[in-house]
């Protein structure tokens, strides 16, 4: 792991929040594991990141968050996220968990949010902090994950949503796309809808709880929203589903084609992988009552 960021590297605008965090006891002084887990709900604009997971030479969400946490807690930390997002993919509700020690329990939630906000750039938003039982995992305790993919099918470029929609610039029939989407609801082998190399030797069955396509309006822009909820998703699964539905929406394939793609269990049978910037990780569902305010 990288060493903890030094105080000299903290921006002047972060000093107040940073000094408040240092006023709390250091976890390094009393490394007694507590019966709690810190869970962070955060959002981010994915445009500037190589993805959530850390990469040696590129900026990542996990890297920025880890360095901020290590500055505040004054120790190394290991993060577990609800779902790894690719480069360019956004999040409104990503969840990250990390074990904490008895010394950490005295940290004020309000001060911790302020410190993490001050120590991260504008494209990361610390939304909320939770306390969960010892051993809780943001990944393995998740019951369902939800994504929204936004498409602008208008001939005019989107303005406010430019970096989080796919400007398709052509007519799409949202009703036909929605009809086709229903064939993917339930438990299926989604091998046709994931990155081929990532499926080698791995299980490709997933359960899709719901999938819908509808016309919406956001910030004055007319968009098509593809909303999907499932227990877990394969690499590029959501974006490949969107790309396949677009083939139907544009009239190049019939609604029934989706059944052929699903049955083929071959990535070549499906449509293209839709661009990353249109995808947003919007929600994670956990067992009721397991997350309590920090």
Q: Language model features by range: what are they?
A:
Residues 2-294:
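Structured-RNA-binding interfaces characteristic of tRNA pseudouridine synthases
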């Amino acid at each position: 792991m990288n060493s903890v960021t030094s105080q000299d590297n903290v921006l002047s605008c972060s000093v107040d929040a940073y000094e408040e965090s240092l006023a709390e006891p250091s976890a390094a002084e009393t490394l007694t594991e507590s019966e709690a887990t810190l869970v962070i709900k955060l959002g981010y604009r994915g445009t500037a990141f190589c993805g959530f997971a850390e990469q040696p030479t590129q900026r990542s969400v996990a890297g920025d968050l880890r360095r901020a946490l290590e500055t505040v807690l004054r120790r190394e930390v290991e993060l577990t996220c609800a779902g790894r997002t690719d480069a360019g993919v956004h999040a409104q509700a990503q969840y990250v968990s990390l074990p904490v020690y008895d010394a950490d329990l005295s940290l004020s939630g309000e001060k911790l949010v302020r410190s993490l906000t001050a120590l991260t750039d504008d494209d990361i938003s610390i939304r909320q902090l939770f306390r969960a039982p010892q051993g809780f995992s943001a990944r393995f305790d998740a019951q369902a994950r939800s994504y929204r993919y936004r498409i602008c099918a208008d001939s005019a470029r989107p303005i406010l949503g430019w970096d989080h929609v796919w400007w398709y610039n052509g007519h799409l029939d949202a009703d036909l796309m929605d009809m086709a989407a229903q064939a993917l609801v339930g438990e299926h082998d989604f091998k046709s809808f994931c990155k081929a190399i990532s499926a080698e030797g791995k299980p490709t069955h997933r359960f899709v709880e719901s999938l819908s396509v509808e016309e919406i309006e956001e910030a004055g822009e007319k968009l098509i929203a593809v909303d999907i909820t499932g227990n877990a998703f394969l690499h590029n699964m959501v974006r490949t589903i969107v790309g396949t539905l677009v083939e139907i929406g544009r009239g190049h394939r019939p609604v029934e084609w989706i059944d052929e793609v699903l049955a083929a269990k071959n990535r070549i049978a499906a449509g293209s992988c839709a661009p990353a910037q249109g995808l947003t990780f919007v929600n994670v569902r956990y067992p009721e009552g397991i997350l309590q305010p920090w």
